[in-house]
Amino acid sequence: QEASDRKYYRIKADNVSYVLADNFDKTDQSANFLYASKILKNSSVNVPEVLAFSEDLRFLLLQDLGDKSLDTDKEFKAEKILEMALEQLSKIYFSDQDVLRSATKESLLIQTNSFIDFCKENKLSNDELKALENLRNNLVQNLLNQQFIPTHNDFERRNLMMFEENLFVIDFQDLNMGPIGIDLASIMYEHSYEYPKVLIDDLLEKHLKNNGLKASSEELKNMIMHALAHRSMRIVGAFNKYFKEGKLLNRKSDLDKFLKRIHLALSTLKKDEAKIVKKLLCCLLYTSDAA
């Protein structure tokens, strides 16, 4: 089950297994999924087959890709997973751009509104809140200056599955034109995995050459760090909102991991606001210990 209230069921007919997605009244998500699926398949991205859907788009019948979600499966080495993931990401880049909506300054700023709410709830001073407000505006400005390409927006291991020795991409309904750093930050600096710097550097160098991207290695790393800070702020804010609604409580332990990702990004970029995030981390850990 997803935070969006979407539910998945595995069903069998004639000894063949399928996945039934129930989107309840969120039929706009179903429409986006179907649209993105067609775009990605046309670009040879491995995505599950859509076999049928109800007239009102509440239900989607999908190909069953099994249970090897790459955020839990330990069979595959990190280097192999990242290489295969970047191969699929390269194919996403070559999706039809003309039919995709584009991220805007407004949409990117909205994504981190809830992070400021989280900071207010954790008793930061007015000066600290003002500094973070300026920071999120600066992050968005950097993102807007990046090369815009087709973007999954949540390109991490839990949205990648291994099926018949091929890596498949799922949950791609938010596909749009976005900053190049977003998907690379998602997969290379995922909250639960610490990859060796030499591996990240090597893979990013190859990724640059293979895709003819308009950046040097250092410029790309800078873009990724700005995207990592923004993405992690978005997720911290979203988690905090879900927790207050009684949703995703099993992921409370991930909150500090995303704060650490914000701190990593800001420290790498030599941003003074890293100290404020460090304070948030200390407050969160103290609260957890007290509980």
Roles of regions detected by a PLM:
Residues 9-105:
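ATP-binding pocket architecture of kinase catalytic cores
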